[in-house]
């Protein structure tokens, strides 16, 4: 009854009453956005949101721009393509690709935060030096590597919710790894990746326990901290 009264007051004032609802699961959040809210009483502004998606956008999308500096692009966080990828276009409109650089995002922990970062990266990691006219093996793709000890089970659940991801994206290579970031072989791979001059490597630690996340982030192979 009290909510109805508030709605009535809002209708009298001809203002919408904002109603913000946090959806913890990204799949539920995606589904609710597709629903049509009943319009019998159009005095409510329904705004669903997801904490993890909001933070993913603050890190890497346009939401990452620092609003304190309106004169230029000033992100709060380094973009995934921290060396801008460019192409050259001649007067005839033909383009040539000089940059062989590519983004490689490694997400450790396929938690809610890890999944949100993954989905946001899929939205934004499309770069100018991908050329679909080249043979498949010569195309420069973004790589996203997802690492979790329980990946086999989690991947099945995730791909059930998002069944068409890989079939709709040609310029991103997705690697699901059922592995432990502390595994010596995995650490050797991280070291190798960090020394690749064309690979723009970003590692996001997203395990559910904050203390473990901090420990993992501070104890990666030394070469990762030494590089750009």
Locations of regions flagged by a protein language model:
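Cytosolic regulatory regions of ion transport systems
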Residues: 1-228
């Amino acid at each position: 009854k009290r909510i109805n009264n508030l709605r009535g007051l809002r209708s009298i004032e001809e203002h919408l009453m904002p109603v913000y609802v946090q959806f913890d699961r990204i799949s539920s959040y995606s589904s609710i956005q597709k629903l049509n809210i009943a319009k019998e009483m159009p005095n409510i502004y329904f705004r669903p949101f997801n904490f993890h998606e909001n933070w993913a956008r603050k890190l890497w999308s346009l939401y990452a721009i620092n609003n304190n500096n309106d004169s230029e692009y000033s992100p709060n966080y380094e973009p995934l393509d921290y060396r801008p990828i460019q192409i050259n276009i001649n007067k005839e409109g033909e383009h040539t690709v000089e940059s062989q650089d590519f983004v490689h995002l490694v997400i450790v922990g396929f938690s809610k935060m890890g999944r949100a970062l993954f989905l946001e990266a899929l939205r934004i990691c499309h770069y100018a030096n991908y050329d679909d006219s080249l043979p498949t093996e010569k195309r420069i793709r973004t790589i996203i590597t997802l690492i979790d000890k329980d990946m086999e089970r989690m991947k099945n659940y995730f791909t059930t919710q998002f069944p068409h991801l890989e079939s709709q994206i040609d310029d991103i290579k997705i690697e699901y790894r059922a592995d432990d970031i502390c595994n010596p072989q995995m650490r050797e791979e991280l070291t190798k990746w960090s020394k690749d001059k064309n690979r723009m490597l970003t590692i996001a630690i997203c395990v559910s326990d904050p203390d473990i996340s901090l420990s993992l982030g501070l104890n990666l192979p030394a070469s990762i901290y030494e590089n750009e």
